[in-house]
Structure formats: structure tokens, C-alpha cells
A protein has these predicted regions:
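Acidic-glycine-rich active-site phosphate/pyrophosphate-binding loop
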Residues: 107-120
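Flexible, gly/pro- and Lys/Arg-enriched active-site loops
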Residues: 22, 41-50, 229, 234-252, ...
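Nucleotide phosphate-binding/pyrophosphate-handling subdomain across enzymes
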Residues: 7-18, 24-37, 41-44, 55, ...
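C-terminal helical cap/extension that packs against the catalytic core
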Residues: 74-96, 109-111, 179-180, 188, ...
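Active-site-proximal loop/hinge segments that shape catalytic or ion-binding/gating pockets
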Residues: 289
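Beta-strand->loop->alpha-helix junctions that form or flank phosphate-binding loops
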Residues: 72-75, 87-109, 125-129, 158-164, ...
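Conserved catalytic-core segment of NTP-binding enzymes
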Residues: 20-93, 219
């Protein structure tokens, strides 16, 4: 259906995100790709992709084809690089990796990103410290499309694109004062990125968390990173057959901080907002699962209107 829609809209360029790995992903039916972007390889979907970073990377690198320019994540784990280099060599193509020495995350307001990358000074539409690396990749992708394939993408267009980028449920700020933030992080890497973003914003345990996870995710490691950010956590059961119950998550969360199981997502958000208000805290963060994010987002948008 997506390809049909793209065809009907007569798109000049299409950005496809793989859903599961790359080699056997549905998006890999496209015979020729201009650019293959490999973001950070982490531990997720291990029951399908493998239990080591090199196995997972080998699946991800399956999107690399002959004639494709490869843009790689600046801080790619060393263990993941072997399969990526092998796939690029077999496809007779080169790898572009943004130079970390050329990338600076500039200080700005809370939960706002500004970067300087190779002379491109830009405000980013996406919060999250990790988005600086993604922005550098986006710049390299645009430059590759210009250099290798003749697409006329101006510097102003690149800067505007970085500023306009939005992704629902990806460290999404729905209200600033008091804070309502939604993030679909569902693995340890995502939890670390959210925690790093909240820490950099100097909230210092001045937040209330609403947390729901799936039972097959590494939620114990996620809790280790996220719990220090919260004065209290309300646990919920996401709307998914694979969900960990709010009660089971609460048992684990209470080893880290004050935790209470809520009857529903709506109940948790209501209690979290009230707790933050009564204790003069900065706000509420809902995170742990995209299933939770889908249910929570309409409720948070309604709350943000008050």
C-alpha cells in the first residue's frame, strides 16, 4: 500500500524505514536504492536478528546494494562494523561516516537541540542528544544525493529540513510548562538516550514517570537507566498481548524508586499529573513502549490543552 501511495503521489524521493532488520525486511524489495543509511546498531528483535551485534549488523547491512551510497552512524559500535564493511565491499560501494570532530552539540534551551556540523549551524526540530548524530547523517545523505545523483538540494533546504523534522512519540514534547513528554523507547539503547536527554536538561529527579513495557524486552536494564530520572513511577500494562503487567513492572521498579501500579493508562497519567502538581515537580514523562505511546498520546494532547 505504501508503494502504491508513493507512485500515485509521484514522489521524487522516498525515505523508507526498515521495520525489522534489513536483509529480509519488506522494504528490501526495492531493487535499487540511492542511499542506505545505517543508524546505530543495538540489541532489539534478538529472537529474529540474532543475539550479538555482529549478527544484527549483518541483517541490517542487507539493505546495501551495488550502486548504493552508504551513510553510517558516527558512533557505530566496533562489533557492528565488520558486517557493514563486508557488505559495502561486496557491493563495491563506499561508506560515508560523519566525522565526530566536525560535530558539536550547542547549548540551548531545555530539550532544544542546536548543532554545528561541518559549518551547518542548525536548530533541530527533534529533541534528544542522539539526534545530533542523526542530523549529521541527514546532512551527509543530502550531500550524497547532490554529489552522486545530481539532486539540487540547497544549504538552506538542508537547514530548514533539520528544523522542521518531527516524529511523534520520539522524545516528543507535548507541553513545556509543566512538562508533558512522550517517548516510545522500548529497548536499553532507547532508554539510555531518553535518560541522557533528561539529564542534560537538568531535571534531576524532578519528574514523574509513566512506564509500560513488553515482557520480551530488556526492561530491567531500561529501568536502571530511567528510574534515576523520576521521583516516582506509575506502571501500566500496554495494550499488547506481549505486555508485562503493571503489577510485575511495579515490583521491579520499586527496587529503584517509589513505584505504584495504575489501573489504566488514563489512570496513570491523571495520577502522575496530580502528583507532579502537588509536589511542585517539573512534569510527566510517558515512556517504555510504542504500544503505550499510541494509547497515551491522545490523552496527553487533551491534557496539554488544559
Amino acid at each position: 500500500l505504501a508503494f502504491l501511495w508513493f507512485a500515485r503521489e509521484k514522489c521524487d524521493l522516498v525515505v523508507l524505514e526498515t521495520g525489522l532488520g534489513g536483509r529480509c525486511d519488506a522494504t528490501n524489495v526495492v531493487p535499487h536504492k540511492l542511499v542506505a543509511a545505517i543508524t546505530k546498531i543495538g540489541y532489539d528483535h534478538m529472537e529474529v536478528l540474532g543475539d550479538t551485534l555482529d549478527k544484527i549488523a549483518a541483517e541490517k547491512a542487507g539493505i546495501i546494494k551495488e550502486g548504493t551510497v552508504v551513510v553510517n552512524y558516527p558512533d557505530q559500535p566496533a562489533e557492528a562494523m565488520g558486517p557493514i564493511l563486508t557488505a559495502a565491499a561486496e557491493a563495491h560501494t563506499s561508506i560515508i561516516t560523519p566525522d565526530k570532530d566536525d560535530l558539536t552539540l550547542l547549548r540551548g534551551k531545555r530539550l532544544e537541540n542546536r548543532i554545528d556540523y561541518g559549518g551547518y549551524r542548525a536548530a533541530l526540530g527533534l529533541p534528544g542528544t542522539h539526534q545530533a548524530n542523526h542530523a549529521a547523517m541527514a546532512v551527509e545523505i543530502a550531500l550524497a544525493l547532490w554529489r552522486e545523483f545530481g539532486y539540487d538540494i540547497s544549504d538552506d533546504a538542508i537547514l530548514q529540513g533539520l528544523a522542521d523534522a518531527r516524529m511523534p512519540a520520539r522524545i516528543e514534547v507535548l507541553r513545556r510548562h509543566p512538562l508533558l513528554l512522550l517517548d516510545g523507547c522500548h529497548n536499553p539503547d532507547g532508554a539510555k538516550m531518553l535518560a541522557a536527554t533528561l539529564t542534560r536538561a537538568d531535571f534531576e529527579e524532578n519528574l514523574v514517570g509513566v512506564l509500560g513495557v513488553l515482557a520480551d524486552k530488556d526492561y530491567k536494564d531500561m529501568l536502571s537507566d530511567l528510574a534515576p530520572c523520576f521521583a516516582k513511577i506509575y506502571t501500566v500494562t500496554p495494550n499488547c498481548p506481549r505486555a508485562l503487567s503493571a503489577e510485575e513492572l511495579q515490583k521491579e521498579a520499586r527496587f529503584h524508586t517509589d513505584a505504584e501500579a495504575a489501573d489504566s493508562v488514563a489512570d496513570a497519567i491523571r495520577k502522575a499529573v496530580d502528583y507532579a502538581d502537588e509536589n511542585n515537580l517539573a512534569g510527566v514523562v510517558v515512556c517504555g513502549s510504542l504500544y503505550l505511546a499510541a494509547e497515551a498520546r491522545p490523552l496527553l494532547l487533551k491534557e496539554a490543552e488544559k
